[in-house]
Amino acid sequence: MSHTILLVQPGARPETRTYCDYESVNECMEGVCKIYEEHLKRRNPNTPTITYDISQLFDFIDTMVDISCMVYQKSTNTYAPYNKDWIKEKIYVLLRQAAFSSNT
């Protein structure tokens, strides 16, 4: 488990910048999914169930002006930066594992 900081800038203005911290990379990726789910709920307030596929999630990530992670590296006692593509790859792996687990 590596402490992970999610840095998000959804809009062009610097005031839209925010961050969240998580105890692990997987927890952070779940957090990104939750951000998207909250976005969908705001856009569709009368829809009782929110569904989406991974391509829609990735499109949402791509609309962000900036989204990146800083992941703690125990060996160097520093945080390493990771970009949108890395985040999408980690989300893909997480969701694939979740789908595999639910099918067994």
UniProtKB/Swiss-Prot annotation:
Annotated GO biological processes are: pyrimidine nucleotide biosynthetic process
Kindly give the InterPro entries that the UniProt entry links to this protein: EHR_sf (IPR035912), ERH (IPR000781)
Which parts of the sequence carry Phosphoserine?
S24
Q: Does the keyword Cell cycle apply?
A: yes
* Post-translational modification note: Phosphorylated in vitro by casein kinase II (CK2).
GO CC, alphabetical? nucleus
The protein's matches in Pfam families, at most eight in alphabetical order, are given as: ER (PF01133)
Q: Keyword annotations for this protein?
A: Cell cycle, Phosphoprotein, Pyrimidine biosynthesis
Organism superkingdom: Eukaryota
Where are the Phosphothreonine modifications? T18
Family designation? Belongs to the E(R) family.
- Job description of the protein: Acts as an enhancer of the rudimentary gene. Has a role in pyrimidine biosynthesis and the cell cycle.
The record's section on PANTHER family has:
ENHANCER OF RUDIMENTARY ERH, ENHANCER OF RUDIMENTARY HOMOLOG
The protein's name is Protein enhancer of rudimentary
Record the organism: Drosophila melanogaster (Fruit fly)
What gene does the UniProt entry assign to this protein?
e(r)
